[in-house]
Amino acid sequence: MSRIGKLPITVPAGVTVTVDENNLVTVKGPKGTLSQQVNPDITLKQEGNILTLERPSDSKPHKAMHGLYRALVHNMVVGVTDGFSKTLEMVGTGYRASVEGKKLTINIGFSHPVILEAPEGITYETPNQTTIVVKGSNKQQVGNLAADIRAIRKPEPYLGKGIKYQNEHIRRKEGKTGK
């Protein structure tokens, strides 16, 4: 058994999981609706509020798919109940961010501000001028958007200036030594 795939998924109250004939899993909850196409080899069984995934054989591809789709369905259930968030910090003089509606404006040392529009289901928050919080119900979308924001100005190794994840450790380098 796949260590991850064999774990059952507990579906909380207020969340409905439906599987159609094409193996499209749809999860509805208080924070929205998410859908994921599951490989036809993987079968989903729901008994009460427990959801389990099963595979046809112990071949390597089936084991891999078993764990993958179990994790994806579990992330959908967590996403529609609690949601996901990624926090980014900006380090540098004059670096700041602000939110106006669904637009995030970042001043990060360029000659122009960088403006990012939030896609459907994603919200931005700025608790202070140097912190950005990306929230949403789709874990992959939140992570990709946070990575895109970080890629605007990655932390550099000499001074540590740039955009980094909250608990990310930046490996620092020593500068040149004089003669």
Where are these regions (language model features)?
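N-terminal intrinsically disordered, cationic/polar leader segments
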Residues: 2-66, 70-147, 151-179
